[in-house]
């Protein structure tokens, strides 16, 4: 599907700086695995005192050992060595970049992985919040913090498990999809896209969706993630979700590619939800406040 040429100009600042989602992180893990597997770690250098989130084990235990692969769990990258794994969360403004220059004071530098030869990997973070960071975790404790807080990975969720979860929660589906405790890897864009593909109002309550709704959501997750991954794998670097093509996200005012109705948005809890009235809400336009009877 081709996006409107206006697509790139539509997202708000907050949307453009959203935390990278599963497609961006997975494709970047694949790129880094291809480029850095087998490279021996010489040094891990944090540039700020907040960059390294753990005290033990020390990063030095991986020095001289080859990188086995770069994996992913939810929105986290995992640099896997034999004794430890470096878990990296990019937050909103972070990137893990191939670092050819290895400047002593890199702009927005948070931490650097230096290898015995070739380029380094540089964790950067734009802005002032400085929330991106690295956890050095023993491999036998990899299921502990911070990954223990995550729900099942988005691509591993089954219709049966999701229906069971829906039955025990009473959340708006858009918020449920973005809650990393419920499903790991989705964010604002994918929540918009999944709701549209599943033909579900973004404010439908999970407790009312049932098995049929759960099956529709799982199918929509796979379709939206597969489309995002296909796009990300054409790139040589990590995009932001604002760059990635979608059906409704960032396309407010455009015609819906499914039915032709105008894509609309509603502000909710500080972010923008995009939806198609015909496909998702029975033609009803959601009021731009949380007290609307259509949001209940």
Model-found features: residue ranges?
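N-terminal polybasic/positive-inside topogenic patches
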Residues: 10-11
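Phosphate/anion-contacting hairpin/loop surfaces
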Residues: 15, 82, 86-197
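Surface-exposed binding/hinge segments that line
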Residues: 15-131
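Generic detection of long, well-ordered alpha-helical segments
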Residues: 19-22, 26, 156, 210-218
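Basic, nucleic-acid-binding surfaces and adjacent catalytic neighborhoods in DNA/RNA-processing proteins
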Residues: 40-61, 71, 163-296
């Amino acid at each position: 599907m081709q996006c409107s040429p206006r697509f790139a100009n539509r997202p708000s600042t907050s949307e453009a700086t959203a935390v990278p989602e599963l497609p961006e992180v997975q494709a970047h893990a694949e790129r880094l695995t291809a480029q850095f597997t087998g490279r021996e770690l010489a040094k891990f250098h944090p540039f700020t005192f907040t960059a390294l989130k753990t005290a033990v084990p020390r990063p030095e235990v991986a020095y001289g050992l080859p990188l086995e692969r770069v994996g992913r769990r939810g929105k986290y990258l995992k640099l896997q060595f034999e004794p430890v794994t470096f878990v990296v969360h990019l937050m909103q403004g972070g990137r893990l970049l191939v670092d050819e220059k290895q400047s002593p004071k890199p702009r927005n530098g948070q931490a650097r992985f230096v290898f015995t030869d070739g380029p380094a990997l540089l964790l950067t973070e734009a802005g002032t919040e400085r929330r991106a960071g690295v956890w050095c975790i023993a491999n036998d404790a990899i299921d502990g913090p911070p990954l223990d807080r995550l729900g099942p990975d988005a691509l591993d969720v089954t219709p049966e498990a999701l229906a069971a979860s829906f039955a025990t929660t009473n959340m708006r589906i858009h918020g449920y999809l973005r809650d990393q405790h419920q499903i790991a890897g989705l964010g604002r864009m994918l929540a918009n896209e999944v709701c549209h593909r599943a033909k579900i109002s973004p404010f439908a309550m999970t407790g009312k969706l049932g098995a049929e709704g759960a099956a529709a959501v799982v199918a929509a997750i796979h379709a939206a993630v597969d489309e995002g991954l296909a796009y990300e794998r054409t790139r040589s670097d990590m995009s932001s979700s604002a760059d990635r093509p979608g059906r409704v996200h960032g396309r407010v005012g455009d015609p819906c590619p499914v039915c032709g109705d105008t894509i609309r948005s509603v502000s909710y809890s500080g972010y923008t939800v995009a939806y198609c009235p015909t496909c998702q809400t029975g033609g009803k336009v959601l009021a731009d406040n949380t007290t609307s009877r259509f949001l209940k």
